[in-house]
Amino acid sequence: MTAQTLYDKLWNSHVVREEEDGTVLLYIDRHLVHEVTSPQAFEGLKMAGRKLWRIDSVVSTADHNTPTGDWDKGIQDPISKLQVDTLDKNIKEFGALAYFPFMDKGQGIVHVMGPEQGATLPGMTVVCGDSHTSTHGAFGALAHGIGTSEVEHTMATQCITAKKSKSMLIAVDGKLKAGVTAKDVALYIIGQIGTAGGTGYAIEFGGEAIRSLSMEGRMTLCNMAIEAGARSGMVAVDQTTIDYVKDKPFAPEGEAWDKAVEYWRTLVSDEGAVFDKEYRFNAEDIEPQVTWGTSPEMVLDISSKVPNPAEETDPVKRSGMERALEYMGLEAGTPLNEIPVDIVFIGSCTNSRVEDLREAAAIAKDRKKAANVQRVLIVPGSGLVKEQAEKEGLDKIFIEAGFEWREPGCSMCLAMNADRLTPGQRCASTSNRNFEGRQGNGGRTHLVSPAMAAAAAVTGRFTDIRMMA
């Protein structure tokens, strides 16, 4: 038998039918649903008189529009409230395997909630009307975002039409240095291959450095695969995967667990499997990263300086750099560690799990928010993350440092709720996109790891965490 990549195995096991042009009907195991991309899909079902094809495939929560403060006041924005209320009504009418409504302890960002509930399992196909669904590939699953029309198709038929991507292996060999996190690895890779480097590919991340990551770290990495242009990112199953999934609410039990684990252990790329493209990086080359521009690929080591567009020979790239520096209010040659920040945001589906909060708390402990920093928002990814963090006393560390301990939600990752930047504010953010206006009109976003964000919060500027004993 021909050696197969992990992507081959996941894809082939879910093909229902293939047309001559390569288009396939792909079966979907898990459908994650939130309030923003589901209303039109549910409305389409109603108009056609259809029901959900498989109620037990749907796991849902409200996240994008939910406020992360003043929960006693409810949702103040009328459009946000309408979307959340509509999700409540639709789930009540159509059903779901599980639903975690606004203010429920299980509620949270869909890409945090799914894995912690065991709704994401190795070998699954996972879709959601959200581009960062690639997060779930960390479990040896085939996961990617879909559009609203595909949300309806999945609800009605349990399938989507798709064409197979090319396969890419990105291996990071060696051991990561102290202070370097999965977020730094993700940003470094994007800086090397560009935001279009993975276009048309499904990326498998491998190598010693990747295998050494926790599941939280792997989720961060796969979350950012979309920012490299890929449709999906994935990591092969190993004992770390299995240990994380065990005893989760929706994980198999007893004999079913034993059979599942036996199968899950096959979810690795075979020896000799051929990828369409491969990259290999040395872990020792990776330093803590900071983005300086308006694309995730505009990223450098913390020890670097803002680049000079005049040194770029490609006129298109040079123009893009000039525009980015103008928007970001930066001058070429400025050391990154001299750039001050106004706001710090630690959260999002990229970095809001308890491991991320522990990293931030380790920096914040016995320190105070810098005087020039206006706000520091700490937003746990779910109610369960919040609960665990409070058990460990992380909330007290943040509050004593002068940070804001918030309720779970997508928060300042995107300007779709009350948490947003104002024009000109510069933010050290653990989110995944630094596009113009992403966090608010005129807001300036720098992507960093949770530890780097916490360091910026207490020093008032971007700071190499390795210099902070």
UniProtKB/Swiss-Prot annotation:
[4Fe-4S] cluster binds at C349, C410, C413. Pathway: Amino-acid biosynthesis; L-leucine biosynthesis; L-leucine from 3-methyl-2-oxobutanoate: step 2/4. Keywords: 4Fe-4S, Amino-acid biosynthesis, Branched-chain amino acid biosynthesis, Iron, Iron-sulfur, Leucine biosynthesis, Lyase, Metal-binding. GO terms for biological process: L-leucine biosynthetic process. Its EC number is 4.2.1.33. It catalyses: (2R,3S)-3-isopropylmalate = (2S)-2-isopropylmalate. It holds the Pfam family Aconitase. GO terms for molecular function: 3-isopropylmalate dehydratase activity; 4 iron, 4 sulfur cluster binding; metal ion binding. Its cofactor is [4Fe-4S] cluster. Binds 1 [4Fe-4S] cluster per subunit. Heterodimer of LeuC and LeuD. Catalyzes the isomerization between 2-isopropylmalate and 3-isopropylmalate, via the formation of 2-isopropylmaleate. Belongs to the aconitase/IPM isomerase family. LeuC type 1 subfamily. This is 3-isopropylmalate dehydratase large subunit. It comes from Neisseria meningitidis serogroup A / serotype 4A (strain DSM 15465 / Z2491).
